[in-house]
Every structure is written in C-alpha cells, then in structure tokens.
C-alpha cells in the first residue's frame, strides 16, 4: 500500500466542454444545445460518414459519437450539419483565454480542442474561498461569454481530476466532482469494466481478466512485481494509476521530449487490404512531406491497420538509416504489413507516425545506398513539396489517388480531417 502522505496533494482541474462541437453548432444557429437534437457529421453527403458529436437530446435516441449518418432517424426535429473547424477553434481559444485570467500559461495544458487541465493550487484562493467555489465561478463565466456548458473534475493530481470528470462530474447536476487520495478506495477501486479506466484498452483488459483482475481495486491490490514482469513500464503505470497516483505535473506537459509527426484516418466504408494500402501510401506521403518541411529525417516508424471489427495490426520499427522519403517509409510499412495483416479482413482505420528525428544535414552517408539516386529522389520530393505549397496539395498526385480507394482529393481543403 502506498503512503499518500508522502505525495503532493495539489488542486488540479480537468475541464470538459459538454458536447462541444454540437453545442457550438447549436449556438451558431441560435439553438439551445440542451434542448436541440443535432448531430455534427464529418460529411453530410456520405451515408457512411461518422457522427463527430451529438447533443444530449440526440444521444437519448441512441445516436452518439462514432455512430454513422445512416443510423440517424429521418425526422424534422433533428438537425444534421457539417463541422466548422475554424469556428470550433475560435471558441476553444476564447475559453482558454478565460481560464488564463486566473493562472499563468504554464499552469494550463490543452489536452484536446474541448478539454484542458488547470493547476490552480497557487491561485484559486485569490478569487474564491474554496476550489469548488472557484470552479462554479469559472463555469459561470465560460457559459455567460460563450454559451458552452462545462463539467469539471477536481483532483489531487491530473489522473484523479480526469477520472473525477469522466466518471462523476458528467452525471452530477452541478457538473463538478472532487476526488482526493482518500477517495481512492471508495470511488476509484469500484470502476469496472477495466476498459472504462483512462489508460486500459480491450486487449490489455483481456490479459488482466485472465489473471482474475476485473476491477480497478483488483488491479491496485495485485502484486506489483508480476504486473511489471508481464507488462513492463505499462504495468508499473497501471499499478500506480490504479492506486490514484500520477506524479506528472501540468507544467511538465509543456516539455515535449519525444515529438512525433503522425496522421490517421477513419475510412468511410470497409476497405479490402489492397485498397487500404492505397490510403496508407497517401498518409505516408503527407507525413513525409511534413518531416521534410522541418528539414528533418526520421529514425522510427510506427503504423497501424485497424480491422472493421475489433483488433488490427500495429508495428514499430527503427531504421538504421533515417529518412524523410515516402518510398523508404512505404517499403518498410508494406514489408511488415504483408506479413502481419489478414488479407481477407476488412479495414476501417489506418495510422502512421514518424519519430526520433535528427537534422537532415546530420544524416550519415551510406556505403550500401546509391547516394546519387537518393539526392535525385530528395530533389524530386522537395520540388513536389514546393508545388503543393504554392498551388495546392492536389496539383501533383499519384495515379492511385484517383482510384476508387483513394481519399486524398476528397480530403483537400479540410482542417483536421473536417470542413472549415
């Protein structure tokens, strides 16, 4: 058992904007987000398009994030609209500016467009008598200035504030919940299934279930050394988190020690393996171009092919010779994908990530590669980059992008994969 008296007990807030995309879209149309049935859909012209957000009233009909357009009932009281990413970003920035009235920038961590952390340990007492009263004040200001409802988790650390918000605050009438170290046995440990916990996926859950671990309490009490032996550093983190311990600080989140450049895509229909390869090539083209724009080369490649049902294939590989050329990356990805992927399966998600960068001019010459040909490939790639920058990303494309499987041209002009 851990001694919580030795741990720092801070006042960390996790703030989530309720049904953010749907709420912003409602407010823009002069509608009440809590009374309107509205869905924000990636592309209203495609029946397989994913629902990005739904208002609470629409969720009562079973439509939620991840549903498909064709699942939404055809009713006159249901609004179906495309996203407006520029508007969402503007509102998100406005909310962050409200938070920054009370704390310095280093005490705020933007977790996503609609969720952020604040460490108010050293500041809340200047504005309110208690942390809870401060949260009420902040929620009220955000609503009055933007029309957005928020839920707030208060915790001794980032982990507890996040789980307090996810598990309890969203269901409380006032939208606020507070979890401290002393609440761990009564609030954290009963959580099940395990995948409802912040850091556990279905695959890890299945492995834990085989060991008789079904609740977070079971995980917290399981011998630490066995978790470490089976799961490595993940096992260490799981045991600490199951006991409510998270020693990361909001301020430390500004220090990016191992940045990566990545791209992922949810496909609009089920793809066969050969079709999925086309989209993967398009994703690789994008990330390779972004690496070149930074004048870097990448050493580590991580990719994933996700099946339409559960599961999929993911692999990480570290190159001996770092690169920023699409053909090098694609060759590595396909080498492993051809061996690991189920050719009869259908695919719905793809992702590619590059990391472990060094400067382009620090790459060592290789005796086993035609450096003259490589220079020509680099010049060609950078020429295409310049054309894309000057005109558009659609000015030069591979033939496969014009096939039925290609998605590049359908995504031109989108921000974060969605319409502006």
PLM segments and residue spans:
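Acidic, metal-coordinating catalytic segment for phosphate/diphosphate chemistry
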Residues: 24, 321-420
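Short beta-strand-to-loop capping motifs
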Residues: 118-122, 321
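DNA-contacting surface of Y-family translesion DNA polymerases
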Residues: 5-7, 14, 206-347
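Short Gly/Ser/Thr- and Asp/Glu-enriched loop/turn motifs at secondary-structure junctions
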Residues: 111-115, 155-158, 296-300, 345-349
